A protein has these predicted regions:
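Auxiliary Fe-S-binding modules of radical SAM enzymes
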Residues: 1-5, 160-235
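Canonical Radical SAM [4Fe-4S] cluster-binding loop centered on the CxxxCxxC motif
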Residues: 6-42
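Short secondary-structure capping/turn segments at boundaries of alpha-helices and beta-strands
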Residues: 1-4, 13, 54
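Short glycine-enriched, charge-decorated loop/helix-capping segments at active-site entrances
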Residues: 32-36, 128-134, 202-210
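Conserved alpha-helical substructure of the radical SAM core
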Residues: 31-61, 65
């Protein structure tokens, strides 16, 4: 658990990293979270007792707790109960997810104030190429978010030569505009911080040799995205 995160939702936030993920994204920087095993075992009530210690910081900054991963949706019973207890304690809740769980989303979203939705790609073909999995489950999750009427911040990783073209950004914007209650779109630059983990774990890193995205290029992509989200240059 990261106690005072500043980039995983509004305000000062505790970030709870949960084990397990079915996706094998080419740019994943946390391969150590793929397996459901490992990490620290803790009960929802015990976790929320730890989170309560930072309640004054959450309140003053407009923050709260963000459940991330891995993919937190793969532990639905734990997640729903932890979110419920957070809400009872007056802690604002946020879910950082790619939307690929077991289809059990209603109880989770009932206690979620904000979804940070990681859009891997906007076409089935591109999604399969990036993640190794079909797009079906994440679309089910989007439908559940729509039904629950939970606001959403969209995030998307921009990789040089893969997802940084103007055509891609415009297509992404068209897709994002179909999503429910999108309040913000953040383009994240591809980085190399997780590459060493692959070497340590004896895994092949499929983007070996691809450079990190420059901040200048990321800003240019973000500017185009912002214009498209306003209805400009989106064709």
């Amino acid at each position: 658990m990261e106690s005072l995160g500043l980039v995983d939702g509004p305000g000062i936030r505790a970030v709870v990293f949960m084990q397990g993920c079915r996706l094998r994204c080419k740019y994943c920087h946390n391969p150590d979270t793929w397996a459901l095993t490992g990490g620290e075992t803790i009960a929802p009530a015990a976790l929320v007792e730890q989170l309560k210690r930072f309640l004054p910081y959450y309140v003053r900054s407009g923050g709260g707790v963000t459940f991330s991963g891995g993919e937190p949706l793969l532990q639905p019973e734990f997640l729903a109960e932890a979110l419920r207890l957070c809400k009872e304690a007056g802690i604002s809740t946020c879910l950082d997810t790619a939307g690929v769980g077991n289809g059990e989303y209603a109880d989770i979203l009932r206690y979620t104030d904000l979804v940070l939705y990681d859009v891997k790609h906007y076409t089935p073909e591109g999604y399969l190429e990036i993640t190794g999995q079909p797009m079906t489950e994440t679309l089910r999750f989007v439908d559940a978010v729509r039904s629950a009427n939970v606001p959403m911040w969209v995030r998307h990783v921009v990789v040089p030569g893969i997802t940084d073209s103007e055509t891609h950004i415009r297509g992404l914007a068209r897709y994002v505009r179909t999503l429910p209650r999108v309040e913000r779109v953040e383009l994240l630059g591809y980085h190399l911080l997780g590459v060493e983990k692959y070497h340590t774990m004896g895994l092949t890193y499929s983007l070996e040799g691809v450079p990190a995205l420059s901040e200048e290029r990321r800003c240019a992509c973000q500017q185009l995205m912002d214009e498209c989200m306003k209805g400009e240059q989106c064709k």
